[in-house]
Amino acid sequence: MSNKKVQSPKEESIAKMLICKVHIGTKNLENKMKRYVYTRAKDGVHIINLAKTYEKLQLAARVIVAVSNPADVVVVSARPFGSRAVLKFAQYTGAQAIAGRWTPGMLTNQIIQKFIEPRLLIVTDPRTDAQSVKESAYANIPVIALCDSDSPLEHVDIAIPCNNKGKESIALMYWLLAQEVLYLKGTIPRSQAWDVMVDMFLWRDPEQFELKNLANEEATPTAPHLADNQYATEAPYDDWNKKDDWNDNANEEWKNPITVDEW
């Protein structure tokens, strides 16, 4: 009989967080983020308490599920590492994703074409997504944010303490959040593991794909290159002057009339 201990969902999620370095904070510490910091390493980096990260993740998922229309939830990421994660989160939960630059006035200026009226806003980083967080305060829209140890908590209603600068950490946090939302909605039972891998939420550099394609093209065998002067030599014409190669009686045969019997 195996003595392997079966991990609870909380232990399994925290183990994944450790692998993706969700607990690694920064050397700077925001005063309001002290409650989420477990300790400080010798190199000055603050270590985030993953137990509180898991609790805030569960709370955020319940708030997202409470919104009746999933399209009223907007997920924002101005940071490139979070662009693929927010798009995948929106794909599986039905939310709206805004990856890249935030157009000023999307929540406050009704004249612009991109004006939206969401009921909930999720941001990847309150610092890089400061414009959207500020506009949500004007429009009275609650905000859920992935907050590092140095992130400002102004106008943030639910802060999920985590490393919001690493691409593995961002991908895992959105994957866990999407998984919990699907569990609460009943889309997938809790007894069943989600068949979507975390790699689907992971950001990939387009330049790496181009370099990989170039390497594959160089490794592909090609036809041997022919020299430019290979076909530049003249064909031999001495044999054309020999009369033996020609039939001298050809002209006389052509002059003979064709009879009907031959047809």
Curated annotation (Swiss-Prot):
Gene3D superfamilies: Glucose-6-phosphate isomerase like protein, domain 1. Its main location: cytoplasm. Residues 237-263 are annotated as: Disordered. One of its GO terms (molecular function) is structural constituent of ribosome. The keyword Plastid does not apply. InterPro entries: Ribosomal_uS2, Ribosomal_uS2_CS, Ribosomal_uS2_euk, Ribosomal_uS2_euk/arc, Ribosomal_uS2_flav_dom_sf. Keywords: Cytoplasm, Ribonucleoprotein, Ribosomal protein. It comes from the Eukaryota. GO terms for biological process: ribosomal small subunit assembly; translation. Belongs to the universal ribosomal protein uS2 family. PANTHER family: 40S RIBOSOMAL PROTEIN SA. Component of the small ribosomal subunit. Mature ribosomes consist of a small (40S) and a large (60S) subunit. The 40S subunit contains about 33 different proteins and 1 molecule of RNA (18S). The 60S subunit contains about 49 different proteins and 3 molecules of RNA (25S, 5.8S and 5S). Interacts with ribosomal protein S21. This is Small ribosomal subunit protein uS2. It comes from Plasmodium yoelii yoelii. The lineage of its organism: Eukaryota, Sar, Alveolata, Apicomplexa, Aconoidasida.
